[in-house]
Amino acid sequence: MKCPFCNSTDTQVKDSRSIENDMLIRRRRVCLVCHSRFTTTEKLLLRSFMVVKKNGETELFNKQKLLSSILIATKKRPVSHEGINMMVNNIFYELEGKKENAIPTNVIGKMVMDNLFKLDKVAYVRFASVYMNFRNINDFSNIIAKIISEKTP
């Protein structure tokens, strides 16, 4: 690893630790020439995959878009950012492990709903109302009845 201060390649790792569910390694390094310390991270490069939208269009999977939709559903709910990030990462790693190069949005939506059902029922209803395109109050009543009877959708 090249030192960012003197450009020497003569560096040494002083400390390493695994973070983000063992998907990222943080290394503390020291340059043996100028003695400066710096931090590097190593991240597993995962394959990219496509998402097939309801209208048939495809686009590259966007982890930030997934996070944003979950943040909207969990807004002002007693859900930690750590829990949300863990959910997003778990969904991403599960999707990444699939053999398909193109994954339909309904598969991703189902995974989000299953995770939100376990995490927070109100966030689950919020997400479901958009994902399942609720049209009237009966749609809300039906999903709430399922929650009360503790059936996963």
UniProtKB/Swiss-Prot annotation:
NCBIfam families: transcriptional regulator NrdR. This is Transcriptional repressor NrdR. The keyword Transmembrane does not apply. The gene is nrdR. Negatively regulates transcription of bacterial ribonucleotide reductase nrd genes and operons by binding to NrdR-boxes. A zinc finger (unnamed) spans 3-34. Binds 1 zinc ion. One of its GO terms (molecular function) is zinc ion binding. GO terms for biological process: negative regulation of DNA-templated transcription. Belongs to the NrdR family. Keywords: ATP-binding, DNA-binding, Metal-binding, Nucleotide-binding, Repressor, Transcription, Transcription regulation, Zinc, Zinc-finger. Its cofactor is Zn(2+). It comes from Ehrlichia chaffeensis (strain ATCC CRL-10679 / Arkansas). It holds the Pfam family ATP-cone. InterPro entries: ATP-cone_dom (IPR005144), NrdR-like_N (IPR055173), RNR_NrdR-like (IPR003796). Residues 49-139 form the ATP-cone domain.
